[in-house]
Amino acid sequence: MAYFEVKGIAKFFGGLAAVNDVSFQVEQGEIYGLIGPNRSGKTTIFNCINAYFPLTKGEIYFEGKKISGLKTHQICKRGVGRTFQVVKPLKRMTVLDNVIASAFLHTRIKSEAVDLAEKTIEFCELTQYKDKLAKSLPIASRKRLEITRALATKPKLLLLDETAAGLNPSELDEAIALIKKMRDSGITIIIVEHIMKVIMTISNRILAINHGMVIAEGSPTEVAGNHEVITAYLGEDYSAQS
């Protein structure tokens, strides 16, 4: 059985199918990309995985055990963490206290939570901001704090949602380096990203979706050259010319 598996999931809001019959598998140690136009269902898939949205149908498995039907905190305890597209740190708390708060999802012992937070901050290269208020951080550091908070829950599988949005070219390179560093530390990653430089550089495989349905899966090169993917992003006219 795959390390992580989504089997025929669907999420309906009334009569609208935000996600419909989506299936994929992720192997341990992989960076697996999710791409698609705006409102194609990518973040909804993340919300279904983490039980922010209950599934309309389908099942989700992690390490051979069914996690669909569990509550969000239970899924986190199993080792599935995530970041959010819109970062919302605890603005009136320091970076360290933000990360400690997340570490308490992994341990209830304060000394262990503090130690875990400090090590995670060092891993993510935020030590210089440790004692600063979260609201004072520049956007790139806020994005990195979001990742740091997620890592403090000690995930084995991490869902990254638009981590690179709003970053300049040098910050993008730093974000890519951090994602690879997380992968090299043993964390399996599923990433939603619009910036093709990021997704094509780091992903082992990519799943493309449109209107909540799978349109392609394969290597970055295979997906980038797929007719349906080109049409979804650039339109029929461009696809016909290519």
Language model: regions and residue ranges:
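Glycine-rich phosphate-binding loops of nucleotide-dependent enzymes
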Residues: 2-5, 9-242
